[in-house]
Amino acid sequence: ARRGRASAYAGLAGFNMFSILNSLQNDLAAPNSSAVFFQAAKKITDLDNMNKAVEDMALLSAPTKDDLLFRSLLASVTAAKTIIVKYDTNMNSKLDNPDQVNFTTNDKKIKSWEELYSHLGSAASPYSLERAYIELADAFDGRGTSWKTISPFASVTKSGSYTQANFNTIEAVGDFGRRIKTANIKYGNSVGEFKAAILELDGVN
């Protein structure tokens, strides 16, 4: 029931797992970059419904591989949409220099950077890119070439068998997480350094 309700919420927000996965894996420019999730986030029309879907999927007691695939992609696209809603102040669906990025941008609208970083970095959080990376690696493990995966925040190492396309998608989550980590290092240094790191989150700059 929770998977069905989560799918409904996500669908209302514009998220279809198969079309999202197809677009992620057919991005010829940078299939292993955070950019793919920001491209996918352009299709999302309602962040609140994405958040509801993430919360519902987190409550599954015995998730299948399909569930892990769904919720890891869901969390990654939700993270990208959250970043866009918070920092794309000129509302052109991308992170660029005209955006008014500072240490407190849209803190009342979206969580503060500290809260957001905790959400995206902690494996205990359903919104976490760390968790999404680990669960996506588990979901895709099974066929293809043997690869080693290293999670972006806690450096959890695993070995698995993946097709090149699937490994690229796992690494895209890793790239997103590493960019978030870099932004957090810059946070508090100077507004200029932090803004530069935020603008690089979508992998376009």
Question: What are these model-derived regions, one by one?
Answer:
Residues 10-64, 80-199:
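Short coil/linker segments at helix-helix boundaries
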Residues 63-69, 73:
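Long alpha-helical scaffold regions
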Residues 3-11, 73, 77-78:
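"A position-specific structural signal for the A-helix of alpha-solenoid helical repeats
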Residues 201-205:
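Extended, compositionally biased alpha-helical segments that mediate assembly or anchoring
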